[in-house]
Every structure is written in C-alpha cells, then in structure tokens.
Amino acid sequence: MKEGYRLLGDFIQPVDERNRDLRVDYLLGVSISKQFIPSIANIVGTDLSNYKIVRTGQFAYGPVTSRNGEKISIALLRDKDCIISSSYTVFEVVNKNELDPEYLMLWFSRPEFDRYARYMSHGSVREIFEWDELCKVELPVPDIDKQRSIVKAYQTITERIELKRQINDNL
C-alpha cells in the first residue's frame, strides 16, 4: 500500500435500518452521476416496510455495476432522511473526526474510483462490486483539517465555475 494510504474498511460500517413502521416515505434512488434522485419506480402496491432508511450523512451504493456506463452508483445523502430499495447497500463513516464524509465523496467522484469498482466487480451476466471489495479500497487519509480544507477548496472552485457559467448564459 502507498505511504499515507489506508483501507476504506477501517473507516466505514454498513447500516441496515428498515422502514418497518413506514415513518419515512421520501423514496429516492442513486444515479451514476453520484447523486440521490427521485425514484422512477412504480411503487403502487409495494410494501415499503422492507426498504432501507438512509439518514442524512450516510452513503448508499448500488453494487450492480453492469450496464451503468462504466460508473458506479454511489452518493452521500445531504438532504432529509429517505428510503431506498433494499438492493442498495447503505453505509456510514464510523468516526467523522478521522474521515470526513464530504472528502470521501470527493474520492468516490473520481473516474479512477469508477474504473477500480468496475475492474473489481465480479460476475458474468450481472457484475457486482461487493461490500468486501469496497472495504479494500485504498485512499489517502490526511489529517481531518487537511481533508476539510480540500473539501472547502473544491466547493469554492465548483461554486465559482457555476457562477461564471450563469454569467456566460446571460451574455
């Protein structure tokens, strides 16, 4: 392993909270653009009690990687709590003072992560990127202040690009 890199599995844990009491009715899915999106599923007559609850600050990913345009569906929930299909895997960062979830999401957004996930997927007809493989991902984990400064710099640049795009659209 490269110096300064750590295994992702040292920082994350799976979460399997079901919607047994049907208190959460905000149904979302996860897109290959790494965002939670409104579900297009027809849920008429569907028992939503087995759907998984995703809490704000948790992640979800679809382990099936085939037919996804070489990308993996993974996202960090920044909105209110939601439910997703039980086919997704939900997980969270165990200690947010060691690994910032926003920093981790930046790592997941890299094309290199998508390539790694596709390469490490197993299966013939239906390729799967399993939890164990996700835990084996090696990533640089600088101290938490450095992670937060990287996230802030990225967000600032992204906001400026969007502002310039809006200005250009008005010209």
Task: Label every model-predicted segment.
Residues 82-87, 122-151, 155:
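A short glycine-rich beta-alpha junction/loop motif
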Residues 11, 100-135:
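Short, positively charged
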Residues 4-61:
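Sequence-specific dsDNA recognition surfaces
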Residues 56, 60-111:
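A short beta-sheet element
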Residues 24, 40, 44-47, 70-72, ...:
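Glycine-rich, flexible loop/turn motifs
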Residues 74-78, 105, 120, 152-154, ...:
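"Short basic amphipathic alpha-helical interaction patches in structured regions
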Residues 1-19, 140-170:
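Non-catalytic DNA-recognition/assembly elements of restriction-modification systems
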Residues 93, 110-114, 126, 134, ...:
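Alpha-helix capping at helix-to-loop junctions
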